[in-house]
Amino acid sequence: MKKTVVAAMLGMAAFAAGAAEHQVKMLNTGKDGAMVFEPSFLKVAKGDSVKFVKVDPSHNSAAVIVPSGATAWKGKMDEEISVKLDQEGVYVYVCDPHKVMAMAGVIQVGKPVNLADAKKQSAELAKGFVMNKDRLAKALDQVK
């Protein structure tokens, strides 16, 4: 019995060790201009985590589009948060105070099962952008 429990625990540890943590920086200025997440597109495996890192002040990360069955997140202002992504699909997130400046990003987890819906909702979201109107569409174009 003890051998079975130990074997099960080792198996779970090996599975957990396979999950990666990726980082997304919250920036005032980056390679794509003002008020950006870097990278703006990230492809990860199911079970991986994404940590939103505060580099510059006055930013947060809030999921606005998630796959069916997934839980959205909303970080506080200037908060570094780590989000575990267990549901396959496309996630779109924004910085609440800079959403109008198209401070948005996309995470693809495994297969993009909700891509059509994510593109449709993102097109509506982009109507509220006052600058960088194609930034979110460019990030979504990287989903494969």
Predicted features, each with a name:
Residues 14-17:
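N-terminal signal peptide c-region/cleavage motif recognized by signal peptidases
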Residues 19-144:
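Extracytoplasmic copper-binding redox domains, predominantly the cupredoxin/blue-copper superfamily
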